[in-house]
């Protein structure tokens, strides 16, 4: 069942919507991480995967305030607010796209 959302996304590959999602968030965060040797994408992935910010901070081995700072930086870069449900869904799609492309699904 875990593969189903990826299957749906795979059918959207190379569409304008797919590329928009990539350019709006994924490409910007990858460029920021490359340029500043940071780990915003990893932090975002952990925050989306865990049940709480505390768990996400623990998984990343960072303080909760550092996690909040990074989520703020993600918002600054992408204009997507982790704490807003529709934006969080958009961010989740980006992480799924990243995983798909990284694993060549």
List PLM regions with ranges:
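Cytosolic nucleotide-utilizing catalytic cores of signal-transduction proteins
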Residues: 1-105
């Amino acid at each position: 069942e875990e593969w189903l959302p990826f299957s749906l996304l795979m059918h959207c590959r190379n569409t304008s919507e797919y590329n928009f999602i990539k350019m709006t968030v994924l490409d910007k965060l990858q460029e920021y991480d490359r340029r500043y040797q940071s780990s915003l994408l990893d932090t975002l992935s952990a925050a989306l995967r865990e049940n709480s910010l505390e768990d996400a901070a623990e998984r990343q081995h960072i303080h909760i305030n550092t996690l909040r700072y990074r989520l703020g930086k993600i918002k600054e870069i992408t204009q997507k607010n982790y704490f807003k449900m529709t934006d969080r869904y958009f961010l989740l799609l980006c992480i799924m796209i990243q995983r798909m492309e990284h694993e060549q699904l």
